[in-house]
A protein has these predicted regions:
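ATP-dependent carboxylate/phosphate-activation module, predominantly the ATP-grasp catalytic core
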Residues: 7, 11, 15-68, 72-74, ...
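Short, solvent-exposed polar/charged micro-motifs at secondary-structure junctions
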Residues: 10-15, 89-90, 151-153
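Short, well-ordered beta-strand elements within core beta-sheets of diverse protein domains
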Residues: 4, 48-51, 178-183
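A short glycine-rich, hydrophobically flanked beta-strand micro-motif that places a catalytic Asp/Glu
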Residues: 3, 75-88, 131, 151
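Peripheral (often C-terminal) accessory segments that flank ATP-dependent C-N-forming ligase machineries
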Residues: 117-208
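Short acidic-glycine loop/turn motifs at beta-strand connectors
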Residues: 17-22, 86-89, 147, 184-185
């Protein structure tokens, strides 16, 4: 199979749909192939930043495409559509994910919305959530991977750390260690906050 390689920004749309309609909630930036956080795959998923920092035009295009795709396939509940937004601002559809997405926590944080509750209401009662148009903060979810075979310390006291392994467990090289959630008023500050904690955690690993 030959596929065209599109230079641009990895993105996604998080949507809630019922049998009668679809509401695209957020356009999200996807973090892909970040080897500084232990990800060894060039296209490996490393988390999200919500929302995607882009123009209203591009955001609207992505949301409209996602809604059309979800409705065309008759999907119900929480669904995601992945894109690459090319350097000249054209969104290319990559795949459809008829499930909860890795961006769930960040979408909940920036919208103040319970995504599981919204999913159930859409599936059982056909109700779509009402969300605010203006988003006043950015949320980063950063997934850390073991750069080498390591023993993980106790991470339970860090409120920003999620998906926490048992203290003292051995994590193999390239396997996920944990997720970090960081909120700030702008995109770069949110990412830097997550990045700073990530470096502290990576520095606390004990090679074995």
């Amino acid at each position: 199979m030959i596929q065209q390689y599109i230079l641009g920004t990895a993105a996604s749309v998080s949507a809630i749909s019922s049998k009668n309609g679809c509401s695209a909630l957020t356009v999200n930036e996807q973090l892909i192939g970040l080897d500084e956080f232990g990800q060894t795959e060039p296209f490996g998923y490393c988390g999200n930043i919500v929302p995607l920092s882009t123009s209203d035009k591009i955001s609207s295009m992505c949301k409209e495409l996602a809604e059309r795709i979800v409705l065309n396939f008759g999907l119900v509940g929480s669904n995601g559509v992945d894109f690459v937004v090319s350097d000249d601002g054209v969104p290319y559809v990559i795949e459809v994910n008829p499930r909860f997405q890795g961006s769930l926590e960040c979408v909940e944080n920036v919208l103040g919305l319970n995504m599981v509750e919204a999913h159930v209401k859409a599936c059982r009662r056909g109700l779509l959530p009402k969300v605010r148009n203006a988003i006043s903060k950015f949320c980063t979810r950063l997934i850390l991977f073991a750069p080498r075979r390591s023993v993980v310390p106790d991470l339970r006291r860090r409120a920003e750390v999620r998906d926490i392994p048992v203290p003292g467990v051995v994590i193999e090289k390239g396997e996920p260690i944990c997720s970090i959630i960081a909120e700030e008023k702008d995109r770069d500050s949110s990412f830097r906050k997550a990045e700073g904690l990530a470096q502290k955690i990576l520095g606390s690993l004990k090679p074995v």
